[in-house]
Design a protein with these regions (language model features):
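Short glycine- and acidic-rich boundary segments immediately preceding or forming the N-terminal edge
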Residues: 1-33, 87-109, 147-163
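C-terminal catalytic subdomain
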Residues: 2-3, 99, 103-104, 167, ...
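Short beta-strand-to-coil "C-cap" segments at the C-terminal boundary of structured domains/repeats
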Residues: 38, 121, 141-144, 251-260
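Short hydrophobic beta-strand that contains or immediately precedes a catalytic carboxylate
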Residues: 47-51, 131-133, 197-199
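Catalytic core of PPM/PP2C metal-dependent serine/threonine phosphatase domains
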Residues: 79-141, 178-190
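Hydrophobic, aromatic-enriched interface-forming segments
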Residues: 127-164, 194
């Protein structure tokens, strides 16, 4: 199934979300999460993507809690990761409410982990401010559709940076994995025709690799309209050597706002 949001014409941003699970898996096994939400101002919105670590227990739940907490809040910097107590308690309550075999319960006690990227967007000053931990990425692509170019990739900027063991945000607070020292922050300005892409790690790495080879896939991303389009893009990425993983992509464009410069 495709996950897509098409705001009404008065909304300041056009945002569409596409996602699919690993090849061979059921949709219920999808462990990424994404969220989009307006704010108390009609010219602002917040978006987030998280990638739950398959090796940990109930990571899909943890990823969903992270993105929902971010888009419903006001934090857009490292302070977001200083205030995870409420969703950590909620994760723990939801997990404790399930009947688990002893070995599954033991694994759950170690917690879930996820990579995260989120941003707040302001249509009036055209600014965006993003925060990230791990290898989910924001890609800022500039230029007219016929002449796209990558302006910024955050928090990873080269495909070779993927594949290691990035620090991930945990659902259980531990003294030896304080997330604050791993937080990255970036900001920019969304000009006319620019797009912001928020993607989970495997798709981010492929998009960067294509760009580095001089074979950018921005036109294909521009052309996405349906689930079939996205599945074709994912199949192309996998045929190109991308590992079999959940894939998530948010595509953001700014609409004209009366009074905006």
């Amino acid at each position: 199934m495709i996950d897509a949001l098409h705001p009404v014409s008065a909304a300041p941003f056009s945002i569409e979300a596409f996602s699919c699970q690993k090849a061979g898996n059921a949709r219920s096994e999808y462990e990424d999460a994404w969220a989009i939400r307006g704010s108390d101002s009609p010219t602002r919105c917040r978006v987030a993507v998280a990638d739950g670590a398959t090796e940990s227990s109930f990571s899909a739940l943890w990823a969903a809690l992270l993105v929902e907490s971010f888009v419903r809040g006001r934090s857009h910097g490292p302070d977001f990761f200083s205030n995870l107590g409420a969703i950590r308690r909620l994760w723990r309550r939801k997990v404790r409410g399930r009947r688990l075999a002893w070995y599954a319960a033991e694994k759950a006690r170690r917690g879930a982990y996820a990579a995260f990227v989120g941003a707040s967007l302001n249509a009036v000053n055209r600014g965006w401010r993003a925060v990230a931990i791990g290898d989910c990425c924001l890609l800022h692509v500039t230029g007219a559709p016929s002449d796209r170019a990558l302006a910024k990739a955050f928090p990873l900027s080269q495909s070779e940076e993927f594949g290691s063991s990035p620090f991930l945000v945990g659902s259980v607070k531990k003294g030896d994995d304080d997330p604050l020292q791993h937080v990255r922050v970036s900001e920019g300005v969304l000009e006319e025709n620019d797009i912001l892409l928020f993607a989970s790690d495997a798709l981010s790495a492929w998009l960067l690799r294509r760009n580095e080879r001089g074979e950018p896939a921005w036109a294909a991303v521009d052309a996405l309209r349906t689930q079939e389009d996205f599945e074709a893009l994912v199949a192309q990425a996998r045929d190109d050597g991308t590992r079999n993983d959940d894939m998530t992509l948010l595509r953001v464009m700014r609409r004209s706002v009366p009074g905006a410069s």
